[in-house]
């Protein structure tokens, strides 16, 4: 699971649909958007929003669970800078697999809007079983009551009960090392949905396997993909060493 702040980046050339609709593609093929989960300080966002490939989306976390107890001026400035560059910012909220009180998550949603002007949310440590469907329906309904156009991302890290697809704009359906990704089995029902409803996070990827990982994600119907060579306790504490090449590879896969 993504344990703390997450930065999700999509190359500006790849116009993602905020509500999770089909990403534009060529010849009827689904397009991929590159996203980055990252434990970045506000200063660390500079590289991500600088250059020709401006991010499409960032997911913001202030603490290890959500918006925190007070606004952080440095993050407020970072959000404003990102939004001014055309970036959509989402707030991060930990759900502890459905064990965190819904009222606490809803308070995070209120704080993100009031303090940062952010209404779309990523619900991390999401449950996968049918027993928590009501919990996530409630949260998604609340998020969309705050802003009907808000995106709701769920991160269970694996494929959930299919009924979660009606709740989420995007489901992070894989989070793990490349060694495990090469053996991933995708449920047959996945092909019934737009690729833009699925995201895959692949870490500990050798540079020589970057193109392979992106190609595998495309073949597995993932419209959002993040690949990093980082590993260890926190593989998200910086951009991948091959980040410029990753952006270019994803863009070529989309438009080529």
Task: State where each predicted segment sits.
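N-terminal export and membrane-targeting signals
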Residues: 1-7
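Glycan-processing catalytic domains of CAZymes
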Residues: 3, 17, 21-256
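Hydrophobic alpha-helical segments of integral membrane proteins
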Residues: 8-9, 14-17
